[in-house]
Regions:
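A conserved beta-strand element that flanks and buttresses the S-adenosyl-L-methionine
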Residues: 56-57
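C-terminal alpha-helical "lid/dimerization" subdomain adjacent to the S-adenosyl-L-methionine
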Residues: 91-141
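Class I SAM-dependent methyltransferase SAM/SAH-binding core
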Residues: 1-47
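Conserved beta-strand signature within the Rossmann-like core of class I S-adenosyl-L-methionine
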Residues: 83-91
Length: 162
């Protein structure tokens, strides 16, 4: 919600005379939001969406209560115009068993090797306990098209039929 996506889409938004609405429930994020369009401080699942052609859900669903995810996405699809799409990028539940352990360790090692302080990594991981719950593929409605996968992170497209 800092505006990275909006900034990367700025030229396209201008060329297509499109409107961007950034949504996040955190007032802290509102304060650092820096992108074209407007910022709305609201939980994504309770926001009153207007009809749209393209929606982007970036690291959002893992913070939506699991029992509300499918209904939220169905409501988004209802607001999506025919031929439009919702792009989802989120964290998936980790693989089970040792493979899941390896992926988690590789993720933490990657953060550390990128220069993030070990204490900061641990503090962030602990702060997410009870707040972040990764998604499962079964929580996505319809037949999502997977366009990206790296470790526990995946990207999907939900298309609204014409």
């Amino acid at each position: 919600a800092t505006g990275n996506i909006g900034r990367s889409l700025e030229a396209t938004l201008k060329a297509r005379d499109a409107r961007l609405v950034g949504i996040d429930p955190s007032d802290e994020m509102r304060k650092i939001y820096n992108a074209p369009g407007i910022f709305v401080c609201s939980p994504a699942e309770s926001y009153d969406y207007e009809p749209f052609d393209l929606g982007i859900s970036f690291l959002t669903l893992m913070f939506v209560e699991p029992s509300k995810r499918r209904d939220y996405l169905r409501r988004l699809l209802d607001k999506c115009r025919p031929g439009g799409a919702i792009i989802i990028f989120d964290k998936l539940e980790t693989h089970h068993g040792y493979f899941g352990t390896v992926m988690t360790r590789l993720t933490l090692a990657g953060k550390y090797e990128a220069g993030v302080d070990a204490k900061e990594i641990i503090e962030k991981e602990l702060s997410l306990a009870g707040v972040q719950r990764p998604i499962t593929l079964g929580q996505l409605p319809g037949v999502p098209y997977q366009w990206f996968r790296f470790g526990d992170f995946a990207g999907y497209i939900l298309e609204k039929p014409i």
